[in-house]
């Protein structure tokens, strides 16, 4: 009888122990942060955007990029801002410094260029290689395709084609990678990293990841030589050991563009992440136009940008 009673107590003990363990597991699961869904950190998949204003309420930027505290932005006017607060689709930035992107760049050293070709530049591009790819292959332009994304291959690949063609015409050897990195989610940059590593085996002068932004059309529109053109924004990853080298290269491009094609550059955005720029000191991400625009105006922007790149790298 005593043995039977002991066994009963033993079973009750183990039953209670299992119950406590089950409850503990459920509570721990509920309180453990869950992995973010791809869409939580996705950028530019649609037409949503963040509006950034300065401390006086002036509009300084609208972008589909993820905007986080401590991100920095050098505006078209070379005003350097730092983001101090983000609240949903609104952000606040304070002025950090007034920069001078053109410091040290003599106007005498810059070529006079015309549409799509720097005809007065003594080119030293022969034998120089460049690489182009697209992390977000599906990005498109609504005025051309009726939608902001067209998987697997959107209008953005044709923007890359226009840029590659212009650079080749200017004397560069260009590899335009069209590897598919879909879907447009948080892992797209991990997939495109393999493409970047592959392209870098040829040791190019620079490598460019070509995108389009999400913002109102007016935020990316300009006119150059009487031609409606999409503006270009350079994006730098600030979680990146090559950030200083990447930023210096970006400043060279912006300063040169400001001289030969005023209004082309929208600015330089330094966001959280690395955008695979840790792989190379001359790795840049270009936002060419916005989803609300068209392939035509984006292609104009890409060709003008190619002239600027030629002016910078053609004089090395």
Locations of regions flagged by a protein language model:
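Non-catalytic propeptide/linker segments at domain boundaries
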Residues: 63, 77-135, 140-143
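A short, glycine/acidic-enriched catalytic loop
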Residues: 216-242, 250
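Active-site-adjacent mobile loop/cap segments within catalytic or ligand-binding domains
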Residues: 267-316
């Amino acid at each position: 009888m005593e043995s039977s009673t002991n066994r009963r107590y033993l079973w009750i003990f183990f039953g209670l122990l299992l119950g406590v363990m089950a409850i503990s597991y459920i509570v721990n699961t509920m309180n453990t942060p869950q992995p973010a869904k791809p869409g939580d950190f996705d950028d530019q998949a649609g037409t949503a955007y963040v509006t950034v204003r300065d401390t006086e309420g002036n509009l300084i930027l609208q972008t589909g990029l993820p905007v986080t505290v401590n991100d920095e932005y050098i505006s078209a006017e070379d005003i350097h801002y730092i983001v101090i607060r983000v609240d949903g689709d609104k952000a606040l930035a304070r002025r950090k410094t007034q920069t001078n992107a053109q410091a040290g760049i003599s106007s005498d050293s810059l070529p006079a260029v015309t549409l799509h070709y720097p005809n007065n530049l003594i080119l030293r591009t022969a034998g120089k290689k460049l690489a182009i790819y697209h992390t977000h292959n599906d990005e498109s332009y609504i005025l051309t395709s009726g939608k902001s994304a067209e998987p697997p291959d959107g209008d953005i690949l044709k923007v890359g084609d226009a840029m590659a063609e212009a650079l080749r015409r200017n004397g560069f050897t260009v590899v335009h990678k069209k590897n598919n990195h879909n879907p447009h989610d948080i892992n797209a940059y991990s997939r495109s990293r393999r493409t970047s590593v592959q392209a870098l085996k040829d040791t190019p002068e620079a490598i460019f990841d070509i995108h389009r932004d999400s913002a109102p059309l007016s935020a990316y529109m300009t006119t150059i030589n009487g031609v409606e053109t999409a503006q270009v924004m350079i994006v730098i990853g600030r979680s990146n050991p090559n950030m200083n080298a990447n930023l210096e290269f970006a400043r060279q491009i912006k300063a040169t563009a400001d001289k030969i094609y005023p209004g082309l550059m929208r600015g330089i955005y330094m966001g959280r992440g690395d955008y695979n720029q840790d792989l190379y000191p001359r790795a840049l991400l270009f936002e060419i136009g916005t989803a609300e625009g068209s392939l035509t105006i984006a292609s104009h922007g890409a060709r003008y940008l190619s002239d600027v790149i030629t002016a910078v790298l053609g004089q090395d």
